[in-house]
Amino acid sequence: MRFPKTLLAVLVILVCPCAFCYGQLSFSGVNGEKGYAALRGQYKLDLDNGLVLTPEYGYYRRSDKEEDEAGSTSRYGLNVSYEVTDDWTAYALARWVPLALDFQSIEYAAGVRWIPFYKKGMFKAPLLGLQAGQTRYDVYSDAQDNPLEHAYSPTETFARAEAETYARKLRLRGIYRKVIKYSSQPPSGVSTNWADVPFMVAVVQGFIKESSAVQLAYPTRNITPYASWVRYKYADHRAFATAVSAGIALHFWDMDFSGGVEVFEPKRQANRRTYFSMTVESKF
C-alpha cells in the first residue's frame, strides 16, 4: 500500500512537537478490496492551560488505479478546544479536502461538551455534547466520472449530538448526526469523495443525510473488546444502510494497539464491503 509524499510531511509535522509538550498521537488505517485503503492521523497537543490543539490528516484511496495518485483524496483538519470549567469544554474545528478527483470541500463547526456529574448510581463521568456546522462542496463530475456541465456546489447545515458514559464496567457511546438542510438538494448520480461514518475508519462516498451510531466496550487493564453499530441514510435514498465493527484493543504502558473488522452493508447484499482496521495510540 503506497501513500503520497504529502503524508510523510504531515507525519513529520505531527511527530516533531511530541518532544516538547504533552499530548497523544494516534494513527488508524483500514485495508479492503481492490486496493482500497484509508488512513487517519492526529496529534492531540495539550498546552496545559486548558487549551488543546489537535491537527489531523486523512488519506483515502479508492482502488489500485495508477492515475491521479491512484484515485486518492486527502483531508486536513484542526480542532481547537478550551476547558472553560471542570465540567464544560468548548471547541471549534475546520476540515479541508483540496481539489482531487473533481471534488473538494471545506467544513467548519463548533460545539460544547458537558459532564453533568462524576458518579451517580451505576453511571460514572457521563459526557454530553452538541455541535453545529456547515460543509461546502464543489463537485465537477458525477459518480461515473462524467464531467458536469456546471459544478454542483451545495452547502449543508448539520447538527450533531453525542453521549458517553461508564455503566459499571461497560463504556457506552452514542452519536447522532443529521443534515438540517441542503442549499440545493443533491441530484441523483452526483456524489462526494469523502463521507464519515461514526466509529468507522473507512471512508465512504455520497451525501449522508442522517446517521446514528452506538458503541459498546468492556475496558480492562490490558484488553478492551469493543463493538459498534451504525445506521445511516444517503440524501438520494429512502432506505438506510448499516455498518458494524468489532475488535480488541491491547494496552501496554502508554501505548494502545487495536485491530478489528468493519463491515458496510448497503441496500443490496452483493455490495457488502469488509475492511480490516488497525489503530495505534501513544501518550507523551
Language model features with spans:
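Short glycine/proline- and aromatic-enriched beta-strand/turn motifs that initiate or cap beta-hairpins
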Residues: 21-67, 73, 132-139
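Outer-membrane beta-barrel architecture
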Residues: 40-44, 77-81, 111-115, 160-164, ...
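Outer-membrane beta-barrel "beta-signal"
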Residues: 110-112, 248-253, 261, 271-284
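Detector for outer-membrane/organellar transmembrane beta-barrel domains
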Residues: 49-50, 125-233
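Residues that define the transmembrane beta-barrel architecture of outer-membrane proteins
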Residues: 33-41, 70-76, 102-110, 153-159, ...
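Short loop/turn motifs that connect adjacent beta-strands in outer-membrane beta-barrel proteins
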Residues: 21-22, 45-52, 83-89, 102, ...
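Sequence/structural signature of outer-membrane beta-barrel proteins
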Residues: 30-32, 58-66, 95-103, 115-119, ...
